[in-house]
Amino acid sequence: LICYSQMYNEIIKTCENGETTCYSKTWRDHRGTRLEKGCGCPPVKYDMIVKCCKTDRCGN
């Protein structure tokens, strides 16, 4: 599976160990709105939003 690994959809990462999900996670802190992308589908705290998907380059 190929997932984006940075805020801007320029850098991609090939997931390892049979990972079948990509994610895009957003939250706000003292620096403003933050965005993280990668492989997997991580658990999140109540003030975060995570979107998980299962196709190549789907975490826009």
From Swiss-Prot:
Gene3D superfamilies: CD59 (2.10.60.10)
Alphabetized UniProt keyword annotations: Acetylcholine receptor inhibiting toxin, Disulfide bond, Ion channel impairing toxin, Neurotoxin, Postsynaptic neurotoxin, Secreted, Toxin
One Gene Ontology molecular-function label: ion channel regulator activity
InterPro entries per the UniProt record, alphabetical: Snake_3FTx, Snake_toxin-like_sf, Snake_toxin_con_site, Toxin_cobra-type
SUPFAM superfamilies on file: Snake toxin-like
Gene Ontology biological-process annotations: modulation of receptor activity in another organism
Tissue occurrence: Expressed by the venom gland.
Disulfide bonds: C3-C22, C15-C39, C41-C52, C53-C58
One Gene Ontology CC term in the entry: extracellular region
Transmembrane segments: none
Cellular compartments annotated: Secreted
Pfam families linked: Toxin_cobra-type (PF21947)
Record function comment: Produces peripheral paralysis by blocking neuromuscular transmission at the postsynaptic site. Binds to and inhibits the endogenous nicotinic acetylcholine receptors (nAChR) in human rhabdomyosarcoma TE 671 cell line with an IC(50) of 346 mM. This neurotoxin is lethal to mice by intraperitoneal injection and to zebrafish by injection at the back of the dorsolateral region.
Family recorded in the similarity comment: Belongs to the three-finger toxin family. Short-chain subfamily. Type I alpha-neurotoxin sub-subfamily.
Protein name (record): Three-finger toxin MS3
